[in-house]
């Protein structure tokens, strides 16, 4: 009986942790969007090729996928990336 209760508690904890992990999705704040060159180097660490042409780039938590919100018009951000 103890094993059944322990197993049930473990499964419930795992489900709660998995659900909480999926809810972590913090978008850019409105005041961050107004600042040039923010987002892609801080959110994506400037190391992802898919963010090279972006002023603001959002990544997933693993840093494998990104979405360019505002393409660069010039190379004004290039020096900040280094």
UniProtKB/Swiss-Prot annotation:
Signal peptide: 1-20
Main subcellular location: secreted
Tissue/organ expression: Expressed by the venom gland.
Cellular component, GO, one term: extracellular region
Disulfide topology: 37-51, 44-57, 50-68, 54-77, 59-66
Superkingdom of origin: Eukaryota
Assigned keywords, A-Z: Disulfide bond, Knottin, Lipoprotein, Neurotoxin, Palmitate, Secreted, Signal, Toxin
InterPro entries: Spidertoxin (IPR004169)
UniProt subcellular location: Secreted
Family statement drawn from the similarity comment of this UniProt entry: Belongs to the neurotoxin 02 (plectoxin) family. 02 (plectoxin) subfamily.
Free-text function comment from the UniProt entry: Potent toxin that may paralyze and/or kill insect pests such as H.virescens (lepidoptera), S.exigua (beet armyworm) and M.sexta (tobacco hornworm).
Record remark: domains: The presence of a 'disulfide through disulfide knot' structurally defines this protein as a knottin.
Protein name per Swiss-Prot or TrEMBL: U1-plectoxin-Pt1a
Organism: Plectreurys tristis
